[in-house]
Design a protein with these regions (language model features):
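Cys/His/Pro-rich metal-binding microdomains
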Residues: 20, 24-27, 245, 302-305, ...
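Conserved alpha-helical substructure of the radical SAM core
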Residues: 1-112
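Radical SAM enzyme [4Fe-4S]-AdoMet core and its adjacent flexible, acidic
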Residues: 34-35, 39, 108-113, 117-119, ...
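Buried hydrophobic side chains on well-structured beta-strands
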Residues: 62-64, 91, 116, 153, ...
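Flexible mid-to-C-terminal extensions adjoining Fe-S/redox cofactors in radical SAM and related proteins
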Residues: 1-7, 264-336
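Conserved, mostly hydrophobic/aromatic
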Residues: 19, 257, 279
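Residues immediately within or flanking Cys/His clusters that coordinate Zn2+
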Residues: 12, 16, 20, 241, ...
Length: 336
């Protein structure tokens, strides 16, 4: 159905490729100085005006992402302009630059949601993200005292923090965190250079058990990310059955102007560029490969009994030639 109907519900804006950290797992390979300059706000606003011609603004969430969005000195101005046009907005942050005063300014600018990255206990987090643990925890403390804001903590599970997830869960609960989201690494950017970032099949199955058990206990609202179909764990580790919404309900505008599906999809799958194309034209008339995925039914997918539910998996796990880079369903099958 989404081949014909593709209601835009989330639009990611890559506001910067600059970052105050240099995380081992960064899929964008972000640094303090970026090769691509920040997209000026005045270049993005016409995109929002165009989006408003094809859907009601209040139905679309604008996710400002990076890099680290808070390195932009005009991030409050960006948020206010998004709000003034009737859109909701939020962002993902490492938390280091978030202060009480800045949070108030962001809320006054209409901020609706924040996700803070915390990747383990202090030693594990700092191994992955440099000496930033206390900055992340300070941000989380600020958010626990904030009303009328949707927020959660995001954790990248890897070899270093896998064995301490129970302790991390207890720490988050004690800190007042209500929502926790877990994801695992895929081979992109700096991440593909470090084998310690990847779980074994047995560890991945244990992770699914940990999430399912935690959800059943009701101690904290924990969910697994959208990293593909999970077989028997569907319905147990997140609130919905897997579906890749890239190009059907989710779009992105990258720092260089490229228009794509979700932020994690490889650059060669870009469908246009805001400096050459109208966003609405691209959204309505392109994205064929993301909306009609029958071309994915090849190689291991052609023989897979889960095809009817999985439909080729998440688009960001497809390589340069459309090949499957990783399949969590097959990983779980191999761990039985």
């Amino acid at each position: 159905m989404l081949e014909k109907e593709h209601p835009l519900r989330q639009l990611f804006w890559e506001v910067t490729l600059r970052c105050n950290l240099a995380c081992r797992h960064c899929g964008s390979d972000c640094r303090k100085e970026a090769a691509v300059p920040d997209m000026p706000l005045e270049h993005f606003l016409p995109v929002l005006d165009d989006v408003a011609t094809i859907t009601e603004p209040n139905k679309v969430m604008i996710n400002t992402v990076g890099g680290e969005p808070l390195v932009r000195e005009d991030i409050v101005e960006c948020g206010r302009a998004i709000t003034d046009r009737g859109f909701r907005w939020g962002f993902v942050t490492n938390g280091v630059l978030l202060t009480k005063d800045l949070l108030k300014q962001l809320l006054d600018a209409g901020l609706r949601s924040i996700a803070v990255s915390l990747d383990g206990l202090e030693e594990e987090h700092n191994w992955l993200r440099g000496n930033s643990y206390h900055g992340a925890m300070n941000a989380i403390t600020l958010l626990t005292k904030t009303k009328n804001l949707v927020w959660d903590v995001i954790t990248c599970v890897n070899q270093r923090n896998f064995s301490s997830l129970q302790l991390l869960k207890e720490q988050l609960i004690a800190a007042g965190v209500k929502k926790w989201r877990i994801f695992t690494i895929f081979p992109q950017g700096r991440a593909k250079l470090n084998p310690e970032l990847f779980l074994t099949p047995q560890q991945f199955r244990q992770l699914m058990e940990f999430i399912a058990t935690t959800r059943n206990n009701g101690e904290i609202n924990l969910s697994y990310s959208c990293e593909g179909f999970l077989g028997d764990y569907e319905g147990k580790v997140r609130n919905h059955i897997f579906r890749c919404d890239a190009g059907t309900m989710i779009a992105s505008v990258l720092a260089n102007g490229d228009i794509s599906g979700c932020m994690s999809i490889r650059s060669q799958y870009a469908q246009g560029n805001i400096y050459h194309d109208r966003f609405s034209d691209v959204w309505n008339n392109r994205f064929e490969k993301m909306r009609n995925r029958r071309w994915m039914k090849k190689d291991q997918c052609a023989r897979c009994k889960a095809w009817d539910w999985c439909a080729g998996g998440p688009f960001h796990l497809r390589g340069d030639n459309g090949e499957m880079l990783h399949c969590n369903y097959l990983t779980l099958c191999s761990a039985k």
